[in-house]
Amino acid sequence: MRASILVLFIVATVSLSIAQQAPPQGINYQAVVYDIEGSQMPGVDAYDLIMANKQISVRFTILQSDPNGPEIYKESHSTTTDEYGLFSLVIGQGTQQSAGDFSSIDWGSGYHFLKVDIDKTGGSNFVTLSNQQFWSVPYA
């Protein structure tokens, strides 16, 4: 009887430890790429400006403290858009270009910003698209 209780306790402990694994190391990122040269007209259909089935390069940089703060992580991706100009990437799974790796980012040490750069030709001549602060997201 005592051995059965011990085995049951061990199985329950192992099951709980497997169920409580660490969250995944990555951030999903998705966007649609348009080939807009000049200004966009409000209310005009931009469907024919979508960069469908094109090879592009995307670079993600995580900055600390403010939008011009020190770079703590940088990576690049080479990907192809789909028929709607859509691409989906996971930040943390690209080609690392910084000294620190994604898993070593201390998210609790102040504000963090994500700078997104793109090269619409698939090369390394990047243009900055955005530089936005990270905000908390619940994880279950």
Regions found by a protein language model. Name each.
Residues S4-S15:
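Bacterial N-terminal signal peptides
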